[in-house]
């Protein structure tokens, strides 16, 4: 059963079921809006030089819902209250090519939609309590280090960001 949190402006879902890619556009559609931006992430075949067969996602769901709600609220503060935001993340076992995260943002203008979408996925990757156990073709598996440890995030933060401090 999916773990679903919905209000009139955003929908957050953590689910063991496959992600229907049309769900974000359906939720974010509004006749007042002229723009929709989305991001889809899926399991890639090679990571850090190793052949990947799949990923098992785990999460502390109550905290994850809280963090994702905060991220959506921050995006509204920065990019405007006239947004609709959809966030869905897979949990459990996934295979190469499976969609694992879907972000959608509807807005009056494209700049707000695109920037808010980027903000939501970046903050999700760095703040949401979601853990990845990567499975490899050789039968081995290993936990993927948290994204907040990545050098890319530290260097991006030094250049400044569009989000709240």
Swiss-Prot record:
CDD domains the record matches: MoaE (cd00756)
GO terms, biological process: Mo-molybdopterin cofactor biosynthetic process
Reaction(s) the record says it catalyses: 2 [molybdopterin-synthase sulfur-carrier protein]-C-terminal-Gly-aminoethanethioate + cyclic pyranopterin phosphate + H2O = molybdopterin + 2 [molybdopterin-synthase sulfur-carrier protein]-C-terminal Gly-Gly + 2 H(+)
EC nos: 2.8.1.12
Keyword Transferase in annotation: yes
Pathway the protein contributes to: Cofactor biosynthesis; molybdopterin biosynthesis
Keyword Transcription annotated: no
Residues annotated to bind substrate: 42-44, 109-110, 125, 132-134
Keywords: Molybdenum cofactor biosynthesis, Transferase
Molecular-function annotations in GO: molybdopterin synthase activity
Family: Belongs to the MoaE family.
Subunit text: Heterotetramer of 2 MoaD subunits and 2 MoaE subunits. Also stable as homodimer. The enzyme changes between these two forms during catalysis.
Function: Converts molybdopterin precursor Z into molybdopterin. This requires the incorporation of two sulfur atoms into precursor Z to generate a dithiolene group. The sulfur is provided by MoaD.
Protein name (Swiss-Prot/TrEMBL): Molybdopterin synthase catalytic subunit
Origin species: Synechococcus elongatus (strain ATCC 33912 / PCC 7942 / FACHB-805)
Recorded name of the encoding gene: moaE
């Amino acid at each position: 059963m999916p773990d679903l949190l919905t209000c009139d402006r955003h929908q957050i879902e953590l689910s063991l079921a496959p992600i229907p890619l049309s769900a974000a556009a359906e939720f974010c559609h509004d006749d007042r809006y002229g723009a929709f931006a989305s991001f889809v992430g899926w399991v890639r075949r090679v990571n850090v030089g190793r052949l990947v067969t799949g990923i098992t996602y785990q999460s502390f769901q109550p905290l994850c819902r809280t963090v994702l709600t905060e991220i959506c609220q921050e995006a509204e503060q920065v990019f405007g209250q006239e947004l609709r935001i959809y966030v869905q993340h897979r949990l459990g076992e996934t295979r190469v090519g499976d969609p694992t995260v879907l972000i959608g943002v509807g807005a009056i203008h494209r700049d707000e939609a695109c920037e808010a979408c980027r903000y939501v996925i970046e903050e999700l990757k760095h703040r949401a309590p979601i853990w990845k156990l990567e499975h490899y073709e050789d039968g081995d598996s290993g936990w993927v280090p948290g994204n907040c440890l990545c050098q890319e995030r530290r260097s991006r933060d030094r250049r400044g960001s569009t989000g709240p401090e």
